[in-house]
Amino acid sequence: MASTADFKNGLVLQIDGQLWQIVEFQHVKPGKGPAFVRTKLKNVVSGKVVDKTYNAGVKVETATVDRRDATYLYRDGSDFVFMDSEDYEQHPLPEALVGRAADFLLESMPVQIAFHDGSPLYLELPVTVELVVASTEPGLQGDRSSAGTKPATLETGAEIQVPLFINTGDKLKVDSRDGSYLGRVNA
């Protein structure tokens, strides 16, 4: 059990038998009336996001989530195989559980896998990943009909928007949460 004062991003709550992760929260103290907490909760199984409001000080049920360091090994059909960094046990995760993270996975990449009652819940990549541009069109100097970006395909097959000066073979820093371009990696 935890109070609303214990809320933090990433905390997993158990509500009506389902697991929900706090994505965002805000303590609100209005001029009139009692304080309350607005939260944005994400269902760890389905990915559905809902807004929920709690009165300040209310106790809620928390779930015990064990985050373990692992390394991505290879893809086996529709499964992604990871090796636990502590006991070297291999964990095959289905494509549905890996989700959008598959766009940024490289072999030997360190990740974290969250477990609840021995079964994997979700996968966490490092916030930034370094990937090489596999292909992109050359950016033309006078071509400014767009906002100064062009599509680029990364070595993992993911397609992101990059500035016009990026070329095939450049190593980029990419935000793994939303696939946004963060910068070039200096060689």
Swiss-Prot record:
GO cellular component terms listed in the entry, alphabetical order: cytoplasm
Keyword Protein biosynthesis: yes
Compartments reported by the entry: Cytoplasm
Annotated Pfam families: EFP, EFP_N, Elong-fact-P_C
Molecular function in Gene Ontology: translation elongation factor activity
Pathway given in the UniProt record: Protein biosynthesis; polypeptide chain elongation
Xref: SMART domains: EFP, Elong-fact-P_C
Top-level taxon: Bacteria
Record's keyword terms, sorted: Cytoplasm, Elongation factor, Protein biosynthesis
Family label: Belongs to the elongation factor P family.
The protein, known as: Elongation factor P
Protein role: Involved in peptide bond synthesis. Stimulates efficient translation and peptide-bond synthesis on native or reconstituted 70S ribosomes in vitro. Probably functions indirectly by altering the affinity of the ribosome for aminoacyl-tRNA, thus increasing their reactivity as acceptors for peptidyl transferase.
Biological process, per Gene Ontology: peptide biosynthetic process
Subcellular location, principal: cytoplasm
Presence of the UniProt keyword Cytoplasm in the record: yes
Matching PROSITE patterns: EFP
